Every structure is written in structure tokens, then in C-alpha cells.
């Protein structure tokens, strides 16, 4: 076993001991999780939030801050380039790659430093398309959006929330200018048998016939799926009094990443990243342990198109939802290897204990 693999396995074992049972998580004080990163996690930037992988997995798009500029980091070289410095604007709250490589932005036309959060509301945040060649300013699509839109990774299709309802449309180009076509309402929150704040998250691969979304303040917060054609809604997290917010989805559609407080149930300021099965079992697996460190949390994860890597952000307790303090890369394959080694060692230890107990009978 090489040093990095050994370090990863040791950390998994240590963190597992810290979280053996609900309600007994030990708090690590006086140190940052960034000081004790396992071999399968690497810090990419020292600022920024809301990462999004390019389709080839070589670059990550991110915001400098809420209502800030958009940047892109090249993972191989670490080179960061600005994407929105070539024109004046009022700042953005979302930036996502479209299927053709252009960028979908969400941001208001006006920003007031004395009332900043108004620019994030659905009354003011608009959707725009910025061409990948950065040949000019973005073009407004004529729609306002509550929080984050869902963007297809395969088609020029988006879904968004407005007025407690979900809408879907295709982005088409006429004379080189993007616009929406075929807009239709796919869900009205008033038709649901429960009350919740709604937000679109992802089209579920591989066929993208289902939309994964958040149901805020329903039984805590639940991960839901909407069959786009039939309108059927499924609860995938099924965890009352627990916070489960869907984030990045795996390319095979079998799992989604979630921000979750299952380990302590203290709410959004104590979240970490989990992997949730979308087979109806509500099975979860914890991937990060940043909230074990006093004052920290991990959030806003996304998955690369090949399913190999996860990008996420570090944040501090007290930060507003979505705020990040740097982007990190999580090697999912390396993690799985380290986890298997840990499980193998645990099994060997259990077998040895059993043999010793038998000998003492």
C-alpha cells in the first residue's frame, strides 16, 4: 500500500470511529479539515463556490462569490481565467455549462449593496446565456428563476422554478442568438399533497425523463423525483426531521449527491456530503466529514460526466447557503479502494476477535 492510500485508509478508519452511532459524533477542535485532507481529496482553489464540471472533466466553472464574477479553472495546470470580466454586470448567483459548452448564468440586472439578497430572489434573478468563446456579453432568455436551474448534460434543455412551479424549455439559436422554445409547466406546487419550497436540481440520466428536485421544509427537506411525462412524484430520501438536499447526480442516474445532516440532525449549518441511492431504498453513504471539525461544513457537490470525480466546496459554519471558501476535488475511485481496504481490515479484526473469544470459552 502506498503512502497516499495508507493515509486515506487510516483517515476513513478514524472518522468511522468518530461516527459509529447517531448522536455520538466527536468534535475536532483547533484544526481545519483542510489540514488533514486524505489522499483522495485535493484542494483546487483557495476561493470560490458552486463548482460545475466541463463535459470533458478538464475544467471547473465556479463563482468567486455570491453576486460575483464567474471563473474557470483548468485542473491539469491550475490556471484560473475570468469568464465575465469582459463586460460590466451586477454579479451572478449561478453558472452552469450547457450541453454545447456555452454557459447558463443566473443574475439580476441591478444590485444594491444595501439590500443584496433581493438580487437572489425570483423577482430579480434572470437567466442568461454566455457564449463559450466569450465574444460578447450574455443574452437574456426572458425568464426569471428561483435559485438554481436544472441543466441537461446531453441536450440544450433547462428547467427552472418560478412562483412555486417548474418550467422546462429548450434553448435554440436564431441568427446566433439564444432563446427559449417549447416552454411548458411541468409541475405546479399547489397540486402536491404536501407544502414545500421547491427547487429544480438535475435531469436524471441516462434518459433524462425524470427531474430531481428539492422539497424544502417538508419533513425537514426531502429529495424528490418528478416523472416529466406523467407528473408522478417520488420521495427518494424518506427521512423525516432530516435535511436532505440533492446536488450533483451520477452519470448512470443510480445515485445523487446530497447535502445532509444525518450524522447529527442539527440543520444546514452542520451538513456534509452523502451519496443517496435513487432505487427507492433511501440508502445513504457519507462521503465527507468536514462537519466533524468545529466550525466547518462541506457543500454543493457535483460529479464529473465520467463519474470518476466529485467537486465540492469547503464552507464555514454560519455561511449563507451556497457560500464557499474554495473548491476541492474528491477522487471517487481512490476513495472506494481505501474504503474496501478499511472494510477488509475491519472484517479481519472481527474474525480475530471471534477466534480469541472462542479460545477463551
Feature map (PLM): residue ranges:
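Bacterial N-terminal signal peptides that target proteins for export
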Residues: 1-10
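Bacterial N-terminal signal peptides
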Residues: 10-19
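Sequence signature of WD/YWTD-type beta-propeller architectures
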Residues: 24-361
Amino acid at each position: 500500500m502506498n503512502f497516499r492510500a495508507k493515509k486515506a485508509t487510516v483517515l476513513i478508519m478514524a472518522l468511522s470511529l468518530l461516527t459509529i452511532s447517531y448522536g455520538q459524533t466527536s468534535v475536532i477542535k483547533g484544526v481545519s479539515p483542510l489540514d488533514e485532507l486524505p489522499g483522495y481529496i485535493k484542494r483546487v482553489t483557495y476561493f470560490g463556490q458552486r463548482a460545475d464540471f466541463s463535459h470533458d472533466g478538464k475544467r471547473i466553472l465556479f463563482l468567486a462569490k455570491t453576486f460575483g464574477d464567474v471563473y474557470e479553472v483548468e485542473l491539469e495546470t491550475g490556471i484560473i481565467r475570468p469568464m465575465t470580466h469582459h463586460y460590466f454586470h451586477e454579479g451572478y448567483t449561478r453558472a452552469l455549462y450547457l450541453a454545447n459548452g456555452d454557459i447558463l448564468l443566473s443574475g439580476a440586472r441591478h444590485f444594491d449593496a444595501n439590500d443584496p439578497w433581493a438580487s437572489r430572489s425570483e423577482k430579480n434573478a434572470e437567466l442568461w446565456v454566455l457564449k463559450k468563446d466569450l465574444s460578447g456579453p450574455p443574452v437574456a432568455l426572458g425568464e426569471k428563476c428561483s435559485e438554481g436551474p436544472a441543466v441537461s448534460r446531453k441536450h440544450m434543455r433547462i428547467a427552472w422554478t418560478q412562483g412555486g412551479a417548474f418550467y422546462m424549455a429548450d434553448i435554440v439559436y436564431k441568427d446566433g442568438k439564444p432563446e427559449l422554445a417549447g416552454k411548458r409547466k411541468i409541475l405546479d406546487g399547489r397540486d402536491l399533497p404536501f407544502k414545500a419550497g421547491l427547487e429544480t436540481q438535475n435531469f436524471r440520466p441516462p434518459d433524462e425523463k425524470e427531474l430531481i428536485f428539492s422539497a424544502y421544509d417538508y419533513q425537514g427537506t426531502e429529495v424528490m423525483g418528478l416523472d416529466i411525462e406523467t407528473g408522478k412524484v417520488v420521495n427518494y430520501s424518506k427521512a423525516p426531521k432530516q435535511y436532505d438536499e440533492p446536488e450533483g447526480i451520477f452519470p448512470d442516474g443510480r445515485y445523487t449527491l446530497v447535502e445532509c445532516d444525518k450524522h447529527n440532525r442539527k440543520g444546514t449549518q452542520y451538513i456534509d456530503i452523502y451519496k443517496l441511492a435513487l432505487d427507492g431504498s433511501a440508502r445513504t453513504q457519507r462521503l465527507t466529514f468536514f462537519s466533524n471539525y468545529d466550525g466547518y461544513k462541506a457543500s454543493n457537490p457535483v460529479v464529473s460526466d465520467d463519474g470518476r470525480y466529485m467537486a465540492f466546496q469547503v464552507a464555514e459554519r454560519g455561511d449563507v447557503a451556497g457560500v464557499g471558501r474554495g473548491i476541492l476535488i474528491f477522487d471517487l475511485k481512490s476513495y472506494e479502494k481505501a474504503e474496501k481496504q478499511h472494510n477488509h481490515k475491519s472484517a479481519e479484526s472481527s474474525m480475530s476477535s471471534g477466534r480469541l473469544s472462542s479460545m477463551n470459552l
